[in-house]
Curated annotation (Swiss-Prot):
Stored InterPro entries: ATPase_NBD, Heat_shock_70_CS, HSP70_C_sf, HSP70_peptide-bd_sf, Hsp_70_fam, ISC_FeS_clus_asmbl_HscA
Keyword ATP-binding: yes
Family recorded in the similarity comment: Belongs to the heat shock protein 70 family.
Superkingdom of this protein's organism: Bacteria
HAMAP family in the record: HscA
Organism placement in taxonomy: Bacteria, Pseudomonadati, Pseudomonadota, Gammaproteobacteria, Alteromonadales
Gene: hscA
Natural source organism: Colwellia psychrerythraea (strain 34H / ATCC BAA-681)
Protein name: Chaperone protein HscA homolog
Function field: Chaperone involved in the maturation of iron-sulfur cluster-containing proteins. Has a low intrinsic ATPase activity which is markedly stimulated by HscB.
Length: 620
């Protein structure tokens, strides 16, 4: 007799079977993969004992090289060797070219889907990232002796929907099953929180190769709650290298544009000097120029500090803003966790220590801590460890909402709301007989549509024809654990429904999230004034339309003088509602309401008379 194996959802049918899972830190400069074995999380090395895989892909004739082998070709074959693809993922061509003008690549494709021309043809950043994920997946299979059930991939907390979706697309292309996308700072908190049993408020300072994130978390009995996040989606150790390259170009008397190989050589020397100066006071630099001559110089730690100090200060300003968002003072922060290879720079560590007035935690390798945290979470998600041991609560970086009449934004999910989350609000129709509604989904902190970012649009059709305001349309916003948004709209009486998964065509501009938040603060008073004006204008339009419809239906209840008074009041309201004076619109609305009071009474009396006509008194 055949037997059915029964198990709880997400758990193995074999009681003590250990499922293979891994955590991947898909980094800008380097990537790692880690797994939990015998209860301990550790990074997995390749056949040469190397944990770190450089995030570099080189497209050669009939072959794709990844990691160290690709890195060796980054100078001599710069156009076919792609580095820091994470910086390009989910971005428009215009954004890439304006932010990174010295990239040695030949771009093609359309504005919203840029591609890089290589020896093997055009490739996009998603395909490049997929090659890195493939390599890490093969490493894990070799190290663990089997196929992975799934992986947790980390992303910067500031990655928007486009960048997160592109990361999932890369995993799908690589044949990797994604259990969850996890914010990098949260992954670091998982690693430190579970290992050291910390409880209280912790700041996670994450400075990687291409992104900076600061997260304020509250850890309590295994619950990780992100109170607020901030940072810069285009600031990292690569920027330290860029300012150092600019300095070397100036010192050597070079004039741009330079050859791709010379640009890459300068970048490698800058990176080498930065790394050497973490332990040395001075380093020698040699550049092989295109003229076949060498240019030599030296760089001191003091010179490096001077060059990068403005960038370090930029990260500290983001720390202050994020603490304010979390409503937390510096004194309440009990620990500061350092994440990312760029936190090895002595100036970064000393300035962070000075800012928070405490020595940062660096006991776990800052290059590995994110991958280790992701591995721990992956182990939980495949059922190797009870979910009750750990709960992760990430947050939305910007408010999500939709457009209402007058170009106003109604926020449905406020900024810094814990995810996953689902929130719904009810809306109604503006006009009599309206049978469709356009739903415009927006992201941002401002009050007007024109000042926020458009994410998606869809239509709800088939709404039963009713008088304005009678229909009840329930709009639901859902953000899943990966930070991806879906929106649905349903008319309650008929059940007609429409929905959309938000997949923007490209990501936010550099600093856009921080800039949007700053703009909302600096323009708060003006925005509220503009919102109040728009609301009064919409109300004026609604009242005028309603009164005109009533006149069309029941003008017989009024004499000519009364009609003239109402029509004059309508004209007056229509005229002032075109202006900018809120009080004038309010006064004109009051005047129209007063002039139609008798009309409203007569319409009510007429409706009652019609309803009672022909009925016996004893049945009323």
């Amino acid at each position: 007799m055949a037997l059915l194996q029964i198990a709880e959802p997400g758990q193995s049918t074999v009681p003590h079977e250990h499922r293979l899972a891994a955590g991947i830190d898909l980094g800008t400069t380097n990537s790692l993969i880690a797994s939990v074995q015998s209860g301990n999380a550790s990074t997995l090395s390749d056949d040469q004992g190397r944990d770190i895989l450089p995030s570099i892909v080189s497209y050669q004739a009939g072959n794709v090289l990844v990691g160290q082998t690709a890195q060796a070709l980054s100078i001599e074959d710069a156009q076919n060797t792609i580095t820091s693809a994470k910086r390009l993922i989910g971005r428009s061509l215009k954004d890439i070219q304006s932010k990174y003008p010295s990239l040695p690549y030949e771009f093609c494709g359309d504005e919203n889907h840029p591609e890089i021309m290589t020896r093997q043809g055009a490739v996009n950043p998603v395909q490049v990232s997929a090659e890195i994920l493939k390599s890490l997946n093969l490493r894990a299979q070799a190290a663990l002796g089997g196929e992975l059930t799934g992986v947790v991939i980390t992303v910067p907390a500031h990655f928007d929907d486009a960048q997160r979706q592109s990361t999932k697309d890369a995993a799908k292309l690589a044949g990797v099953s994604v259990l969850r996308l996890l914010n990098e700072p949260t992954a670091a908190a998982v690693a430190y929180g579970l290992d050291s049993g910390q409880e209280g408020v912790i700041a996670v300072y994450d400075l990687g190769g291409g992104t900076f994130d600061i997260s304020i978390l509250r850890l309590n009995k295994g619950v990780f709650e992100v109170l607020a996040t901030g940072g810069d989606s285009a600031l990292g150790g690569d920027d330290f290298d860029v300012v150092l390259v600019d300095y070397l170009v100036e010192q050597a008397g070079l004039v741009r544009p330079l050859s791709p190989s010379l640009e890459r050589q300068l970048m490698q020397q800058a990176c080498f000097a930065k790394e050497q100066l973490t332990t040395k006071e001075e380093v020698d630099i040699t550049i092989s120029l295109d003229s076949d001559s060498d240019w030599k110089t030296s760089l001191t730690k003091a010179q490096l500090n001077k060059l990068i100090s403005s960038l370090v200060n930029k990260t500290l300003r983001a720390c202050r803003r994020t603490l304010k968002d979390a409503d937390i003072t510096i004194d309440e922060v009990i620990e500061v966790v350092m994440v990312g290879g760029s936190t090895r720079v002595p100036l970064v560590r000393s300035e962070v220590e000075k800012h928070f007035n405490k020595t940062p935690l660096t006991s776990i390798d800052p290059d590995k801590v994110v991958a280790i945290g992701a591995a721990i979470q992956a182990d939980v998600l495949v059922g190797n460890k009870p979910d009750s041991d750990m709960l992760l609560l990430d947050v939305t970086p910007l408010s999500l909402g939709l457009e209402t009449m007058g170009g106003l934004v109604e926020k449905v999910i406020p900024r810094n709301t814990t995810i996953p989350v689902a929130k719904a609000q009810e809306f109604t129709t503006f006009k009599d007989g309206q049978t469709a509604m356009a739903v415009h989904v927006l992201q941002g902190e401002r009050e007007l549509v024109e000042d926020c970012r458009s994410l998606a649009r869809f239509e709800l059709r088939g709404i039963p024809a009713m008088t304005a305001g009678a229909a009840h349309i329930r709009v639901t916003f859902k953000v899943d654990a990966d930070g991806l948004l879906s929106v649905s709209a349903m008319e309650k009486s008929s059940g007609v429904e429409s929905s959309i998964e938000v997949k923007p065509s490209f990501g936010l501009d550099d600093n856009q999230i921080s800039q949007m938040i700053k703009d909302s603060m600096s323009n708060a008073a003006d925005d509220m004034q503009a919102r109040m004006l728009k609301e009064q204008q919409v109300e004026a339009s609604r009242v005028i339309e309603s009164v005109q419809a009533a006149l069309l239906a029941d003008s017989k209840l009024l004499n000519s003088d009364e009609i003239t008074v109402i029509e004059n009041a309508i004209k007056s309201l229509a005229q002032v509602s075109q202006g900018q004076e809120i009080k004038a619109i309010e006064n004109a609305l009051d005047k129209l309401n007063d002039s139609t009071a008798i009309f409203a009474e007569r319409r009510m009396d007429s409706s009652i008379s019609e309803a009672l006509a022909g009925q016996a008194v004893d049945k009323i």
